[in-house]
Design a protein with these regions (language model features):
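Conserved acetyl-CoA-binding loop-helix of GNAT-fold acetyltransferases
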Residues: 23-26, 32-45, 70, 159-172
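Amide-forming acyltransferase catalytic core, primarily the GNAT-like/NAT-type
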Residues: 71-156, 161-162
Length: 208
């Protein structure tokens, strides 16, 4: 089985249609028969006919990453930081609605190729994490985060970790695990179906 979630990739004034593939699974009794490859080939064919420009997914393991690479998917980089001890809380942190977060996020990411999330995507993400506006001195940003015991899991912080202390004002924690744009850690994978190719697309949420 596989599911395709329609999304949009944006870069400045450019945008194109993408399908986020998730829950790609083969029953254990039918593995190693090429069924997954045939399923993805069928999805690619059908989505191309529907004028989608690319496919994105997030592999759960390194072995799956290698497998998807053999099918033409290319890893897109992002940055992960295990901060260890959380920084001292300082600055201003305000709770945002999904609509408010969408607007602020697009402003911050305007110059970078990224997946633009619709309100339905963000409302689903809001069932797992909160959205926040951050201010620290002259620095402004936004974040999506949730506590996990004594660790603050930051699903996204923009434009970078410079505004992380402000997030701790709303969500105190002893440790932080952070994802942000840039860096060289492989995360999402992308396969282009058209000539609307964009470099290193940033995808934040795997909706896992």
């Amino acid at each position: 089985a596989a599911y395709a979630l329609p999304q949009e990739v944006a870069w400045g004034e450019k945008n194109c249609r993408t399908a986020y593939l998730y829950a790609v699974t083969t029953h254990p009794d039918f593995r190693k028969r090429g069924i997954c490859a045939k399923l993805l080939a069928y999805a690619e064919k059908e989505l191309t006919k529907r004028y989608f420009d690319c496919l994105t997914l997030v592999p759960a393991t390194d072995a799956l990453r290698s497998y998807y690479a053999s099918l033409g998917f290319v890893s897109q980089n992002t940055a992960f930081f295990d901060e260890g001890g959380a920084p001292e809380a300082r600055g201003v942190c305000e709770v945002l609605t999904p609509a408010e977060y969408a607007g602020l996020r697009e402003t911050v990411l305007y110059d970078l190729p990224h997946v633009r999330y619709g309100l339905s995507d963000l409302r689903y993400q809001a069932s797992m994490s909160g959205f926040y506006r951050l201010e620290l001195g002259s620095h402004f940003g936004c974040a999506c985060a949730h506590p996990d015991g004594e660790t603050l899991v930051v699903d996204e912080i923009l434009p970078d970790c410079s505004v992380l202390p402000a997030l701790l004002k709303q969500l105190p924690a002893k440790q932080c695990r952070v994802r942000t744009v840039g860096g060289s850690a492989p995360f999402a994978m992308c396969k282009w179906l058209s000539d609307a190719h964009m470099p290193d697309v940033y995808l934040a949420f795997d909706f896992g």
